[in-house]
Amino acid sequence: MAIAERVSCVAQSLLRSWPRRSLWPHLAVWGLIALVVVVLAATTRAYLHGARSYVDNGDGYYLYAAHRLAQGAVLYRDVMGTQPPLVYALGAAVFKLGGALATLRLVSAALRALCTALVFLAGLRLFGNRLTAGLAALTYALLPIGLEWDRSFDVNPPLTLLALLAMWPLLRFTPRAARLAGVLAALALFTKNLYAPLLVISLAYLAWRRRPLLGPYLQGLVVGLGALSAVLAAYAGPAGLYDAFLGQQSSPFNPTGFVVSVYYVITREGAVVLMAIMGAYLCWRESRSRRLEGAPALDYAPWFLGGASAVLLATLKEGTLWPVFQLAEPAVALLAAYGVTWAVRPRPRDHGPAAHVAWQRTARRPAVALALPAALLVALASVAGADRAALAQGNAAEVARVVALIHAHAQPGATIVAPPYYALLTGTRIPGDAADSYILAQRVRHADPWAIRWVRGVTRDLSARRIPIVLTDVRSDMIAPLKAALRAGYRPVYGDTLPPALHVEVWLPKMRDD
């Protein structure tokens, strides 16, 4: 009994000597989550407040095409399609269920909220640390490129969501999870082929670091691509497959777009990107030393940043610009948060009080521990200011004036020549449902037979003044025959005050005495 009592006393003494866990990490995590909720609520409010603002031509194109699908049109056959089908299907489902434009803005906000939640979960899986995961979620919620452009109905938000969903099972590192990740990667490719760099990086990572999982991942990928391709071919025919993945091949190479996009990313998010690069280096070093416990997926994080950032190479093609960097923002947020919290993260090599004291000594890196969070705080404050300025911009009043002009001269269901967003708002139709006017102009330049027939039909209607009202912008101005026929039979009556990329000029048929 004496020995048992002595052992009990020693155990109690050791327990008393073990330092009590501090409450502040838990409070910090919940504080970060509360801030994320506040940011997402403010973002949703801003999206709804500017629901009818003209954000981007692509926004109008996807909305118009999705609305036509909800009315029974067939994508790639009845409606011009230049991207894989999933984003059109998402919009069509919302319209089919009775949703309006404000509903689509709510969908955009919901996609952003889901991406933020997945960034938090990915942070837990990659780094095994709730504080890092919470900081990554807050950083992602504030990054301005995604926050500004996610309000438009575009392919990039659902692509970002599916990229994160595809990463989540991959990081489980089991054959079954790898197969599921392959299927989700196929879904991401059927959202937009810009997922290809991340797919290549994932395959390279598995081949280099997790060879036994490469086979199951490829099985899921092949099965997913095969099933989706069969469904699409049955729905729209072989031409649908071509338009879905090669519909934008007519756009030329333009290195200037790449330079402008890189410059834009640097000016908007450069400080956070720099921290992410530093975080990737620290992450790579930690994963090589195997010192961080509870983070078996740590070695994937730098690969994720590299593959996601490679999406900027798509801007070498004209018509694709900096909004594609939305796909890289989860990786930027995750690695920046890791770099900031790296200096204060526990790294016990052993267990017990001695290990805790050793960790306290190694964790005292005051220069790094103070400088990096301070730098991120300054960067996020600047980013928040940019977010507020971007979301405060609205042009709904100018859009309403143009819509009123259309309503005054065209009935719902009438065919007009206009950017697709205005056709959607007024319930009118675009000739041939050729809503992607930029790709249409490029196909006219390449003498595509369908595009040439479209131009001949529209110019014939313009010459006969059968189209009641015409709205031109920088994309339709690239179609020279259209512009010539317009000048011959129509007169400009109004030009809005929007920026050049959104500016429209309203034309009405000339009177007989004009």
Regions found by a protein language model. Give the residues of each.
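Short helix- or helix-capping micro-motifs
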Residues: 136-142, 159, 185, 189
